[in-house]
Amino acid sequence: MELSSACNLSLKPNYYYYPTSLFPSNNSYNNLKASSYYQTQRPIKCCSYSPSKYCSTKKLQTTHLLGLYAKHKCLKPFSIGHLPRPNSLTAWSHQSEFPSTIVTKGSNFGHASWKFVRPIPFVAVSIICTSLFGAELLKNPNLFSWQLMFDAFQGLVVILLYHIYINGLNQIYDLESDRINKPDLPLAAEEMSVKSAWFLTIFSAVASLLLMIKLKCGLFLTCMYCCYLVIGAMYSVPPFRWKMNTFTSTLWNFSEIGIGINFLINYASRATLGLPFQWRPPFTFIIGFVSTLSIILSILKDVPDVEGDKKVGMSTLPVIFGARTIVLVGSGFFLLNYVAAIGVAIMWPQAFKGYIMIPAHAIFASALIFKTWLLDKANYAKEASDSYYHFLWFLMIAEYILYPFIST
């Protein structure tokens, strides 16, 4: 006979008592352990209590397995105080579920938001701003102050919010193709709702504009920033969708990454330092160098997305001419850019530190050749193409890290 068909009598708060008449042999504990309802957290003692006084023994013999707390008239717990002992562990766990759920949801949303802002470009923008401002500060160390650093930090926040705004629009309107090309993005992976994405995008645009006004950046910088907010929207938002056309996509990258951001940051940096804007040779070099890279990156960015672009009908250069052709052409122009940088250092030693520029760009060029060879060896698979494109971003970041130290 199973123990679960017995009546139980709770005489003490820490024990369950079961009548000995219910056990078929003296080896009661062995039978008890064999039962699927054995409870390890409370010791069980046997007593001489007879169940016939409270329920029929005939029913006990024929009752099917119901469990210690099943809905049966003979299985209700009974205590001296006529009150069942509350399960304090269960109650505590229910009380602790609420804060635990809040923490988990907050952590998941934070992780999805970090993926939403695209970490690699986010870090790249931070380095670009720091490098351009740092180059001006190194030339004028006497102007350093903590208030200056605080104002510069607020300017960095403006640029980062602009970056979130641009990337947010791009992900919202590219959701269908991202499910194929970039399934790890939070919207494509359904880790974040479209409503939350819109909130982050609009908040970033409004907050950055308000911060610009608070910093009193002047009419020229504020109007220029508003223009880039509009141009950034036209890149992704229908019916414009400049990114769908190779020419308009390249033009946007050239104006935004190559000229716009660099000019905006340098102008703001010198204004913060109380200096007039000036076209110095190092700044002219970085504008020309990065503008060329921005054109190359706008072409090569579609190499990892060939399959998805074909399915959604996007006519990108890798789709038309093939990934291998575009990669070889893009890498070739990248190498020419490095050759030009070495030539500039040789021709204008009075403006540039050749002992830094020449070996650094030679190393960058060698690394690019090796990475292109690895991509060709991998037959331009998506994973290898992603790695190659990210490596190009690292090369551009390395150029900005080098920038404050190339000027004589």
UniProtKB/Swiss-Prot annotation:
PANTHER family: HOMOGENTISATE SOLANESYLTRANSFERASE, CHLOROPLASTIC. The lineage of its organism: Eukaryota, Viridiplantae, Streptophyta, Embryophyta, Tracheophyta. Belongs to the UbiA prenyltransferase family. Homo- and heteromer. Interacts with PT1L, forming a functional metabolon. Involved in the biosynthesis of prenylated phenolics natural products which contribute to the bitter taste of beer and display broad biological activities. Catalyzes the two last prenylation steps in the beta-bitter acid pathway. Uses dimethylallyl diphosphate (DMAPP) as the prenyl donor. This is 2-acyl-4-prenylphloroglucinol 6-prenyltransferase, chloroplastic. Pathway: Secondary metabolite biosynthesis. Keywords: Chloroplast, Membrane, Plastid, Transferase, Transit peptide, Transmembrane, Transmembrane helix. Residues 1-46 form a transit peptide. InterPro entries: UbiA_prenyltransferase (IPR000537), UbiA_sf (IPR044878). It is an enzyme of class 2 (transferase). It catalyses: a 2-acyl-4-prenylphloroglucinol + dimethylallyl diphosphate = a 2-acyl-4,6-diprenylphloroglucinol + diphosphate; a 2-acyl-4,6-diprenylphloroglucinol + dimethylallyl diphosphate = a 2-acyl-4,6,6-triprenylphloroglucinol + diphosphate. Changing D174A: Loss of catalytic activity. One of its GO terms (cellular component) is chloroplast membrane. The keyword Transmembrane applies. It is found in: Plastid; Plastid, Chloroplast membrane. The chain crosses the membrane at residues 119-139, 146-166, 193-213, 217-237, 257-277, 281-301, 326-346, 355-375, 388-408. It is a multi-pass membrane protein. Its EC number is 2.5.1.137. One of its GO terms (molecular function) is transferase activity, transferring alkyl or aryl (other than methyl) groups. Its cofactor is Mg(2+). Expressed in trichomes. It comes from Humulus lupulus.
